[in-house]
């Protein structure tokens, strides 16, 4: 096990983007993407505590308690009995406010990397719990639907987050994911504030049915059922008004053969699931066309589901 006194010990990790909610599973479903990824380099320091170094131009806080990765590491270190100092350098390829888990990537990468430095003392559920403190900094809520797939990989169901995270990994058939990120910013905290706090029972019943059907479709590798279940009757009608081109992308993508999709996390990114790469490329063309007509800068990703979560680029070195 690496010792905190071995101050040359370091590790480099890739932390993946993630799609949260997966249309109908608000705060309880998510999956990891094979691209883009943040790169994070962690090493021990002589001074106990957390040091944050941002290697990009996003002007993110470096005070640990106000930084997503920093808050996650502070929670991690509170569970470590001996005094430990960790420096983390963050190079973000996942733009903050994009809706594809930028804050979760920082938090998940930080705790997985720190756990590697300390000899993997903590379990994945414990790492999720630490990383949720970072999400609280970003959104005001300690949620895990980006964190869990970022740490576990694949598709995850969050059965509960209290008193301890109860994460259920789900198998899924091969799926292609097309993501478009229109270059506007939607803050998670703002997107949560506009949500209704009370839901009519009729809509709740519809949503439960969709979540159950989506989980069943994934487990049974039933593409048709997956497509039918990708319906949100509670969150999407409220949040979609924040995203220009939402209806055009959704309708055009389904006409091109996509199984379905919707808002990634709180937006503004939109995602669509397809059974094959040819359909995913047709969906990408639809997305380009919509935002070119709207005159909005945008970026697309055509990728697949990342089954590993945060991965080591370079193992702990002495």
Task: Locate predicted features.
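ATP-binding N-lobe of GHMP and related small-molecule kinases
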Residues: 2-98, 116-122, 153, 306-308, ...
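Gly/Ser-rich oxyanion-binding loop with an adjacent helix/lid
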Residues: 3, 83-164
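Glycine-rich beta-alpha junction loops
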Residues: 17, 35, 46, 181-186, ...
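Short beta-strand-to-turn element immediately C-terminal to the catalytic PLP-Schiff-base lysine
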Residues: 43, 149-161, 272-275, 313-315
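Short, conserved charged micro-motifs
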Residues: 48-51, 188, 278-285
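Acyltransferase
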Residues: 174-251, 255-256
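Glycine-rich, charge-dense phosphate/pyrophosphate-binding loop(s)
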Residues: 218-318
């Amino acid at each position: 096990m690496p010792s905190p006194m071995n101050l040359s010990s370091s590790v480099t990790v890739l932390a993946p983007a993630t799609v949260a909610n997966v249309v109908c599973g608000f705060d309880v479903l998510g999956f990891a993407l094979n691209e883009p990824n943040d790169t994070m380099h962690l090493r021990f320091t002589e001074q106990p505590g957390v040091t944050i170094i941002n290697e990009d131009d996003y002007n993110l806080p470096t005070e640990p308690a106000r930084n997503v990765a920093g808050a996650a590491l502070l929670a991690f270190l509170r569970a470590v009995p001996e005094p430990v100092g960790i420096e983390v350098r963050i190079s973000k390829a996942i733009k903050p406010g994009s809706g594809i888990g930028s804050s979760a990537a920082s938090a998940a990468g930080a705790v997985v990397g720190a756990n590697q430095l300390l000899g993997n003392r903590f379990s994945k559920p414990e790492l999720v719990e630490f990383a949720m403190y970072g999400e609280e900094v970003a959104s005001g809520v300690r949620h895990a639907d980006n964190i869990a797939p970022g740490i576990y990989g694949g598709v995850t169901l969050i059965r509960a987050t209290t008193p301890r995270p109860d994460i259920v990994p789900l198998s899924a058939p091969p799926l292609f994911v097309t993501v478009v990120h229109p270059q506007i910013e939607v803050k998670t905290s703002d997107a949560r504030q506009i949500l209704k706090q009370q839901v009519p029972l009729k809509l709740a019943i519809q949503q439960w049915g969709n979540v159950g059907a989506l989980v069943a479709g994934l487990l049974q590798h039933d593409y048709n059922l997956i497509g039918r279940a990708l319906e949100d009757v509670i969150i999407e009608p409220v949040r979609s008004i924040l995203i220009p081109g939402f209806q055009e992308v959704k309708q055009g993508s389904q006409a091109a053969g996509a199984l379905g999709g919707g808002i990634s996390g709180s937006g503004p990114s939109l995602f669509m699931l397809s059974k094959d790469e040819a359909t995913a490329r047709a969906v990408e063309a639809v997305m380009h066309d919509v935002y070119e007509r709207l005159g909005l800068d945008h970026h697309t990703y055509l990728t697949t589901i990342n089954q590993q979560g945060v991965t080591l680029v370079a193992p702990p070195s002495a």
